[in-house]
Amino acid sequence: MRILDTASAEYLSAHTGVASRHMVHVIGRNRETGAQEALGLWQGDDHLTIAINGANRTYYGAGGLIGVEPIRAGIGLEVRMLQATLSPLTPEVALLLRGYDTRLAPAEVHRGLLSLETGQLIAEPIRVFRGWVDEVKIKTGEVGGTSEATVTLASAARGLTRALTLTRSDTEMRRRNAGDRFRDYADIAGEVGVWWGEKRERA
């Protein structure tokens, strides 16, 4: 069950209408510097800087984020997929898709509630999805046509399906501790005969 702040709970319970915008935040690796950099997009008309969990984030508007498909919530460990449609013609989206390596990049989707009178956010946006970038597809339109990009996100449950990458080879153990020789002969252990309480036969 999602716990809402007081302002959001009162807004939704008023039954006078709801105005909301989605926000997508991705942390990708800069292809030139190798540094991890964050980039946010939202459905608003202007750029926005807002505190999320105590840290300021900048979300770029003006058409970069076209839309997010309906989010399906549920109980369990099922990996859920979510698609966001972007406009590759905006500089921020072009940077995200071509300037960053977004393979398995951490991503979050928030939902911001807007005042019906002022059009401003009434409270800190509510996180509605968290996971990783699973796939990016770019569709380039013909002359006079429409171009768009589709980013598919996999929910955080995907982390439970990852295999353990750490091996117990001698090389891996020495990488962690150069003096660790516990598995010095691990690669030939199955080929060496062992005699327990028996007379060893000579070859």
Stretches found by the model and what they are:
Residues 64-66:
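Outer membrane beta-barrel transmembrane domains
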Residues 80, 129, 147-149:
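Envelope-exposed proteins and targeting segments
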Residues 138-153:
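Short, solvent-exposed secondary-structure boundary/capping segments
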Residues 70-106, 113:
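Extracellular/virion structural assembly segments
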Residues 1-61:
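Polar/acidic, low-complexity leader/linker segments enriched in S/T/G and N/D
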Residues 3-4, 8-10, 94-134:
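Short, acidic/charged, Gly/Pro-enriched secondary-structure junctions
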